[in-house]
């Protein structure tokens, strides 16, 4: 049985012996071929078996399931099988919201009430290398007016929801899970600990580390050995779909369910606008009783973003899932839509754009994971050497995506979507300056530059809707990207969590010029008859109520260009292409409780 191992078989624990037998039965004898006798490299061999046990324990169904899934998917890939064969696409049902109207406000209010029964899950396994940034992505500043990093912004948003949803109810603590990877785990923990968890109780936060999966060297799904080390299987990330199996195996979902929670919200690591959209989307989930609610944005036909689509199979099965943009057009053409993916009379595709933020109802989610063990339908993307598809240029692996969770759901599941305007909900930071500068004009840059400018734009438009006179933006080319530069307006989530909250804090005749900066750092800051031409920062503790009025006029903060190649500047500034020269500002700080008036 263990012939290729020879006497090395005796080095193994009973658990390892079982695993090795299973591997040998599944065509993996090459792993142990030509091993030296016991006494040579024993420590390396033991480390190898420990690695195999880890790979086995961290995959639903173990390594044998991984190998069998790989054989099936690799055979489909070689044969050119289309996963959508037999499926007909149609437009799913969902809710389209318009910021600030009565319907939107109603959903926002419902979502805030519901937040006390929610848990949040951040998928944060990535580093910022693709952005030209050497750290973890969640440590990047979302904007540089205040320097607030993404993780701080997310935590402060959850805390603001926690507080708002507790009004009139008992105090609650909203749980927050962060999925990390080997690359990000230690640094994420350091970021939290060195900043006192940004105001959260450490017990509210759980880090779940994702393991990698084995690489595959050929169509027979033989596990690939590390070219530099015969006692190590080569591994690569499995994708963010692992979040489901991690939540399942950790037991945390049952804890939440027993504590009376009802919703799990999943989000990704660098979208500075996301929490503006969450209250209303959660309100849609609770009002419509969706088991799965995908947040979406209007999508232009053929735009490079997946479309949310209902797929109905000839055998009667149906599902509502994300279909990647390069698959959606051919699928539509093959299904009686001769023009494929085209814009409707609204000017947008009827298939909304998936932004990878999901709201799941906890009860049905637990039931589904009990059936699947948290496994998500996978795919494989081998790079073949030639058209024969018999060998790979380099090893491949199976991958899975968080948003493919609905693929296994029964037809009775209520799967919907909520469409929000892009300016309000979606500004991811994922492209470096060079790549963003190559994006065709009119398409989104999705860079640190555009991500920061999108925050100022959204805040400006929200204040405008609340009655502020906000000057029009100017167009400027920064890091090779033409962006709208609005007044640099920022506020803490607890100040303006919802539109109705913003409206309650702004009154009279208020205005701000395009070159201005306004940073609101406090909960009870009320703005009345204020005009800003320059820079104004108001910082107040929670129990300080501050009324701000009058006319602020100073030289302000100048926006100065930074060349992304200029190594004398910090990376966080180089990747966005600008910095603020803080020439002059009015800064008011209130560190004691009480009522205060600031008249400029």
UniProtKB/Swiss-Prot annotation:
Q: A GO term (biological process) for this protein?
A: UDP-N-acetylglucosamine biosynthetic process
User: What does the record note on temperature and activity?
Assistant: Optimum temperature is 45 degrees Celsius.
Q: Name its co-factor(s).
A: Mg(2+); Mn(2+)
Describe its PTM? The N-terminus is blocked.
Cysteine pairs bridged by disulfides in the record: none
Q: What is the annotated signal peptide range for this record?
A: none
Coiled-coil residue spans: none
Q: Which reaction does it catalyse?
A: a monosaccharide 1-phosphate + UTP + H(+) = a UDP-monosaccharide + diphosphate
Tell me the domain of life. Answer: Eukaryota
Which keywords does this Swiss-Prot/TrEMBL entry list? Nucleotidyltransferase, Transferase
Q: How does activity depend on pH?
A: Optimum pH is 6.5-7.5. Inactive at or below pH 5.0.
Gene that this sequence comes from: USP
Supply the EC number(s).
Answer: 2.7.7.64
Activity regulation note: Inhibited by a high concentration of pyrophosphate.
Concerning CDD domains, the annotation shows: UGGPase (cd06424)
* Protein name as annotated: UDP-sugar pyrophospharylase
Protein family (similarity comment): Belongs to the USP family.
Q: What class of enzyme is it?
A: transferase
Q: Which Pfam families does this chain map to?
A: UDPGP
What is the source species?
Pisum sativum (Garden pea)
Tell me the GO molecular function terms.
UDP-N-acetylglucosamine diphosphorylase activity; UTP-monosaccharide-1-phosphate uridylyltransferase activity
């Amino acid at each position: 049985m263990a012939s290729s191992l020879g006497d090395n078989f005796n080095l193994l624990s009973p658990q390892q012996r079982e695993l090795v037998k299973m591997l040998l039965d599944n065509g993996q004898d090459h792993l142990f071929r030509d091993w030296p006798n016991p006494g040579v490299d024993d420590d390396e061999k033991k480390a190898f078996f420990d690695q195999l046990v880890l790979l086995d324990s961290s995959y639903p169904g173990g390594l044998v399931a991984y190998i069998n899934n790989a054989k099936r998917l690799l055979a489909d890939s070689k044969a050119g099988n289309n996963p959508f064969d037999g499926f007909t696409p149609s437009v799913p049902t969902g809710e389209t919201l318009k910021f600030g109207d009565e319907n939107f406000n109603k959903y926002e209010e419902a979502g805030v009430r519901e937040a006390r029964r929610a848990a949040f899950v951040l998928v944060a396994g990535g580093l910022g290398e693709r952005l030209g940034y050497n750290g973890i992505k969640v440590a990047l500043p979302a904007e540089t007016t205040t320097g607030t990093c993404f993780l701080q912004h997310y935590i402060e948003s959850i805390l603001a929801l926690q507080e708002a949803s507790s009004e009139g109810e008992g105090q609650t603590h909203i749980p927050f899970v962060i999925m990390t990877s080997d690359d990000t785990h230690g640094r994420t923990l350091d970021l939290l600990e060195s900043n006192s968890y940004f105001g959260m109780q450490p017990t509210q936060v759980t880090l779940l580390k994702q393991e990698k999966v084995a690489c595959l060297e050929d169509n027979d799904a033989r596990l690939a050995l590390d070219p530099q080390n015969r006692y190590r299987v080569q591994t690569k990330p499995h994708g963010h779909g692992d979040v489901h199996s991690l939540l399942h195996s950790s037991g945390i979902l049952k804890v939440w369910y027993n504590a009376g929670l009802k919703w799990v919200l999943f989000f990704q690591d660098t979208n500075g606008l996301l929490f503006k959209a969450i209250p209303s989307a959660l309100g849609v989930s609770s009002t419509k009783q969706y088991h799965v609610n995908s947040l979406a944005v209007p999508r232009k036909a053929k735009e490079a973003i997946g479309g949310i689509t209902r797929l109905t199979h000839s055998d009667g099965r149906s599902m509502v899932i994300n279909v990647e943009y390069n698959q959606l057009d051919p699928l539509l053409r093959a299904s009686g839509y001769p023009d494929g993916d085209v814009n409707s009379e609204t000017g947008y595709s009827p298939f909304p754009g998936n932004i990878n933020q999901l709201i799941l109802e906890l009860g049905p989610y637990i039931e589904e994971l009990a059936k699947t063990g948290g496994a998500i339908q996978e795919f494989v993307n081998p790079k073949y050497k030639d058209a024969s598809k018999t060998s790979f240029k380099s090893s491949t692996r199976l991958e899975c995506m968080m948003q493919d969770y609905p693929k296994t759901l029964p037809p009775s599941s209520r799967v919907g979507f909520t469409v929000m305007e892009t300016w309000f909900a979606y500004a991811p930071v994922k492209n470096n300056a060079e790549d963003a500068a190559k994006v065709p004009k009119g398409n989104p840059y999705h860079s640190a530059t555009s991500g920061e400018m999108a925050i100022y734009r959204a805040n400006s438009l929200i204040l405008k809707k609340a009655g502020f006179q906000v000057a029009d933006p100017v167009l400027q080319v920064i890091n090779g990207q033409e962006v709208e530069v609005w007044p640099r307006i920022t506020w803490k989530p607890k100040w303006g969590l919802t539109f109705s909250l913003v409206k309650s804090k702004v009154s009279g005749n208020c205005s701000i010029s395009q070159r201005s900066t306004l940073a609101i750092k406090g909960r009870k800051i009320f703005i009345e008859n204020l005009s800003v031409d320059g820079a104004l920062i108001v910082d107040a503790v929670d129990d300080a109520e501050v009324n701000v009025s009058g006319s602020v006029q100073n030289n302000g903060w100048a926006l100065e260009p930074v060349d992304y190649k200029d190594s004398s500047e910090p990376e966080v500034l180089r990747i966005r292409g600008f910095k603020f020269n803080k020439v002059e500002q009015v800064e008011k700080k209130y560190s004691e409780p009480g009522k205060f008036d600031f008249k400029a």
